[in-house]
A protein has these predicted regions:
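Short beta-strand element of the alpha/beta-hydrolase
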Residues: 23-32
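Conserved alpha/beta-hydrolase "acid-adjacent" motif
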Residues: 204-210
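Short beta-strand/loop motif that positions the catalytic acidic residue
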Residues: 190-191, 196-199, 203
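N-terminal cap/lid segment of alpha/beta-hydrolase-fold proteins
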Residues: 1-22
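Alpha/beta-hydrolase active-site loop
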Residues: 68-98
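Catalytic histidine-centered segment of alpha/beta-hydrolase-like enzymes
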Residues: 228-241
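Hydrolase active-site cap/lid region
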Residues: 118, 122-168
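Conserved alpha/beta-hydrolase
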Residues: 47-65
């Protein structure tokens, strides 16, 4: 994969499609948190299917500059989109690529599922896949306790992940407001035709009930899985690629 930076801050891996088509189709991958960036095999899978793929790191996470959650993570992705169409220069050898997407899709899981849903509000985005997404940060206390015994979750992240996440207590607490980076707050704005969710009923970290409630409130489609736990986005995308591709195609104009 190639590497570039958008807005001089946001480190992004990218791949061109294995075979170029008449139209440029772009998929943006949105990571969970905390996680280790490891969606490169998924990016290769999608590039082999004919898609451009970009895999950004949120500001303040991993190789990107800035402070994590200083602004809503989905806005980091919008900042990337604001530089497209355009030429991107890969860092290692300076080769330039022209990315001019005719269609843009998003695939995000867990924490990144919230980004996917919020990105669906942007008219440039045709369709999004949200796997085991956080739909409402009212689950935060429960989710924190499932991951650590420490009372201060941001402190746990700093200790366990070091500088991988430059996360302050104040920025983490913004999630508790119900306003910041919260799909539930925007449920009345969601176009149900643009969102497809996957969620396992036995997910121990992000409760299935949140996706079911979001489905009822918005009319988005939810693919419910009996088992699987906090299932990986790589697995979901590969296993259900036929359904996902059909869903993407339904958004063509």
């Amino acid at each position: 994969m190639f590497r570039t930076r958008f807005k001089k801050e946001i480190l992004t891996e990218f791949l061109p499609p294995l075979r170029a088509g008449k139209k440029q189709k772009l998929i943006i991958l949105c990571d969970g948190m905390p996680s280790i960036p490891r969606k490169q095999p998924l990016a290769e899978f999608l590039a082999a299917k004919g898609f451009w793929v970009i895999y950004p790191r949120y500001r303040g996470a991993w190789e990107s500059d800035g402070e994590f959650l200083a602004k809503s993570p989905h806005e980091d992705i919008l900042d990337v989109l604001d530089e497209l169409p355009g030429e991107v220069e890969e860092i290692a050898f300076g080769k330039r690529y022209r990315i001019s997407p005719n269609e843009i899709f998003v695939i995000g899981g867990s924490f990144g599922g919230a980004a996917a849903i919020l990105l669906s509000l942007d008219p440039r985005i045709k369709r999004v896949i949200a796997n085991c997404p956080v739909t409402d940060w009212g689950l935060l206390d429960r989710a924190e306790k499932a991951e650590t015994l420490k009372e201060n979750y941001a402190e746990y992240i700093r200790e366990a992940f070091g500088n991988a996440y430059r996360l302050s207590d104040a920025n983490w607490q913004k999630l508790r407001t119900g306003v910041f980076y919260n799909p539930w707050r925007h449920r009345k704005e969601v176009n149900p035709a643009k969102v497809l969710m996957f969620h396992a009923k036995d997910d121990p970290y992000v409760p299935y009930e949140g996706s079911r409630r979001f489905e009822e409130a918005t009319g988005v489609k939810l693919k419910s899985l009996r088992r699987g736990g906090h299932i990986s986005t790589d697995y979901i995308t590969r296993k259900y690629w036929g359904q996902i591709k059909k869903f993407f195609d339904s958004g063509r104009t």
